[in-house]
């Protein structure tokens, strides 16, 4: 008779091995606990520091941190909710300087910054400065960027990657709750090794999901590159450190160290391949799961994919793209289809890497072979439209009758009218909320709304129009 395991609610934070059930937000709470335990096992006395500002899809992160306060304290982790996102980021920059002004209590402080897309935007100045300055070799910083691709609880449909690219911060894009944990641990190790802050993309599809995950200590084993030579003085934060020295270190060494780390740890990997592949699919994060669903719609499992000549390259670090892996993947392919939501980040990098090669496949993604729109950059991609894009290329390359039949069916589904909700409910303020009275304006007056719940005053009988970004409320009247 199989003995049932004794399960406790706190297992999501205290279990050291086996499998546990938790959601994406709870995985982010568990993550620093795991890092502290790993450091302790490796003989380091580290502490953790978490700061940021709430916002969907990270709207419940601070609440879950407060609930888990005793677990944070047991692991020397301090959580302070930020006044705003950029002040929080500056505090994390300061945490990396522990030990620079005398003897420190800890060997290093690992950090977590969190904020939704607009918070990433407003923190760009801090990100640039802090990433140039570097990190502590026993610290490191993860920047959790909450992206609301479909603008379900935001004023913009946000994609934060390009803000981080501008600051030259590497970006990890997890597919599912398990990879939130895995990539988080890789992220801190990478941050320490390369001296960079590391972004971790957090979408509602991942954060709001729940899953049973493996938390064994041996799941993520960090490997350090043997093909990268550290410059004299290393890559970590130091003082004094002139700005042009910081720039040279970032451009010439840090990003090369990032690519070497990705290569050594297999963060980008081939998920499906055969001997005579002609169509390669390059994808990442949530889009990887959509690609798998799209292939299922087409009746294509791994064995069928090998017959049809389809391969998949799953990118874990979407910027900078490690060049060796994608170049090897592209060998022998006739076409590469890049599947990613929003603006193309991977596609241009794939083209840049493959362009100098003597033999290279045609690369399509946002545009098709004729330069027409293929996978749109607005909204969110759905598995059905991805299935159509894949099937069209497979039909061209193989002429397979089964694919043709599936393609016809998928196209017919795309033409059907979307489902209409059985009942529409206009969002309103909660009972007892001060906004119920505070948003009422005197007769004959006009008001401008703010961001957040106050935004809803625009569709109420309150003579309220327009809105601003966070922190700009009222300033429109100046103009």
Q: Language-model segments: which ranges?
A:
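Flexible, low-complexity linker and terminal segments
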Residues: 2-31, 35, 174-429, 434-435, ...
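Thiamine diphosphate
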Residues: 56-192, 203, 436-440, 446-479
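Carboxylate/His-rich catalytic cores and anion/metal-binding grooves
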Residues: 39, 45-52, 434-448
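N-terminal glycine-rich anion-binding loops that anchor highly charged ligand groups
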Residues: 27-42, 53-66
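Secondary-structure transition/capping motifs at alpha-helix termini
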Residues: 37-44, 68-77, 98-107, 132-138, ...
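Short glycine-rich or small-residue beta-strand-to-loop segments that form or flank ligand, phosphate
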Residues: 47-53, 78-82, 110-115, 144-146, ...
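Short, glycine/acidic-enriched capping/hinge loops at junctions between secondary-structure elements
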Residues: 40-44, 61-64, 123, 211, ...
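Generic alpha-helix detector with strongest preference for long hydrophobic helices that associate
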Residues: 6-13, 42-46, 73-76, 92, ...
